[in-house]
C-alpha cells in the first residue's frame, strides 16, 4: 500500500518522494516529467535560467505531464563587493584555462540579481509548488506566490532557520542535513555551526515548526525514506539519487564519478562557486583550496561566474577533474537507471521497510 502523508495528500502525490531542484542543467524536462509521471514531485532547478528559458522549460514540461511539479529559485542575496585585488583568483584559474585551450580568465562583472524577473516567469510557469534556498524571500514575493495558489517551501539547515521560514509564511520546510550534496542552504548561522546531520536535524525541526517537514541529505533508498518519515518528516527530498538517472542533464563524466565514488570522498568546497557546497573531491578542489593559494577564491556568485567557462569546457572534454561534481555522502548507494524505475524502486523499498518494522513491533 502506497505511503501517504499530509504532504502527499496536500500536493496530490502517490509517494512521499521529491526530486531535489538541482540548478545548472541536471533537472531536464525528461527527468522532471518522468518523476512526476511516476507519482513523485519533480522540480525544475531554475536558479540559473533566464526568464525566457524558464518559460520554455515550463511550457515543455506542461506538454509532458498534467501532474503537479515544482520550480525553485535562489532567494535574492546582496550583491558582493569585487575584491580590490582579484589577481590571486585569476592567477589560480589561468593554468587550467591554458590546459583546456581557453583564453586567459577575466574578472567577472558584478551582475544584478535576476530574482525579480525570474520570479515573474516562475509565477507563469504552471508549477504547483515554489521552493527556494539561501535565505528568506521578500514579503512581496511571498504574497505574489501565495496569490497564485502555489505551495511554498523554504530550506533550513538549523531549527532557528526553520522557525524564521515558518514565521515568514512558508507552507513546508526542507530540513537540509550536512550530508546533502551541492550548495548549503544556510542563511542565519555560521556554515560550520550549521553542519547538522539529517538524523539529528529532522526531528528537531519537526518538533519546532507546525508545518510539514521534508528531510534532505544522504537519503538514497527506501530505508532512508522510511527513516525520514519515522523522524517526523512528511517526505524525503533526494538529489544525488536522481543525478545518475538516464534523464539527468549532468555530463557523463559527472555520472561516472558519482557511480565510482565512496562516502568518504565528498567534502565541502568553495572552489567552484564561492559558497560552501558538497562535492566529490577532485584536482580543482584540492589545488584551488590548497595551502599555497590564499585569497584565490572570489565571493559568491563571482567565483561561480569565473569558473563557468572552465566547467563548460571540461564538460565538453570529459574532464571530471575540473567539474563541480556535486554529490552527497550517500553516494556509494547511487545506481544507473531510469527515473521511473528509481521512483518505483524507492517506493517499493520504503513500503517494505515500514511493513517490516510494523510486523516486528
Give a label for each model feature:
Residues 1-208, 346:
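Active-site entrance/lid segments in N-terminal catalytic domains of soluble metabolic enzymes
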Amino acid at each position: 500500500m502506497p505511503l501517504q502523508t499530509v504532504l502527499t495528500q496536500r500536493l496530490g502525490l502517490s509517494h512521499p518522494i521529491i526530486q531535489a531542484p538541482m540548478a545548472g542543467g541536471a533537472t531536464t524536462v525528461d527527468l522532471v516529467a518522468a518523476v512526476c509521471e511516476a507519482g513523485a514531485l519533480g522540480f525544475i532547478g531554475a536558479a540559473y535560467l533566464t526568464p525566457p528559458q524558464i518559460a520554455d522549460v515550463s511550457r515543455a514540461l506542461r506538454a509532458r505531464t498534467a501532474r503537479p511539479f515544482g520550480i525553485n529559485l535562489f532567494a535574492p542575496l546582496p550583491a558582493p563587493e569585487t575584491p580590490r585585488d582579484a589577481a590571486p583568483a585569476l592567477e589560480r584559474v589561468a593554468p587550467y584555462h591554458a590546459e583546456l585551450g581557453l583564453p586567459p580568465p577575466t574578472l567577472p562583472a558584478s551582475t544584478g540579481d535576476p530574482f525579480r524577473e525570474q520570479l515573474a516567469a516562475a509565477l507563469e510557469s504552471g508549477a504547483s509548488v515554489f521552493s527556494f534556498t539561501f535565505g528568506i524571500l521578500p514579503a512581496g514575493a511571498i504574497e505574489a506566490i501565495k496569490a497564485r495558489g502555489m505551495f511554498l517551501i523554504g530550506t533550513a539547515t538549523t531549527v532557528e532557520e526553520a522557525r524564521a521560514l515558518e514565521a515568514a509564511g512558508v507552507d513546508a520546510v526542507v530540513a537540509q542535513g550536512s550530508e546533502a550534496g551541492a550548495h548549503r542552504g544556510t542563511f542565519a548561522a555560521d556554515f560550520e555551526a550549521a553542519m547538522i546531520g539529517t538524523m539529528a536535524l529532522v526531528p528537531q525541526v519537526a518538533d519546532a515548526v507546525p508545518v510539514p517537514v521534508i528531510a534532505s541529505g544522504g537519503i538514497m533508498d527506501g530505508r532512508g525514506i522510511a527513516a525520514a518519515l519515522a523522524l517526523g518528516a512528511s517526505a524525503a527530498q533526494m538529489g544525488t539519487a536522481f543525478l545518475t538517472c538516464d534523464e539527468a542533464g549532468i555530463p557523463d563524466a559527472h555520472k561516472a564519478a558519482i557511480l565510482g565514488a565512496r562516502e568518504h570522498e565528498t567534502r565541502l568546497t568553495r572552489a567552484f562557486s564561492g559558497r560552501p557546497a558538497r562535492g566529490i573531491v577532485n584536482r580543482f578542489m584540492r589545488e584551488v583550496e590548497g595551502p599555497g593559494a590564499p585569497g584565490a577564491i572570489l565571493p559568491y556568485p563571482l567565483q561561480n561566474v569565473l569558473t563557468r567557462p572552465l566547467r563548460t569546457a571540461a564538460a565538453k572534454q570529459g574532464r571530471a577533474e575540473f567539474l563541480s561534481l556535486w554529490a552527497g555522502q550517500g553516494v556509494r548507494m547511487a545506481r544507473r537507471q531510469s527515473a521511473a524505475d528509481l521512483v518505483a524502486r524507492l517506493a517499493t523499498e520504503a513500503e517494505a521497510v515500514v511493513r517490516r518494522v510494523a510486523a516486528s513491533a
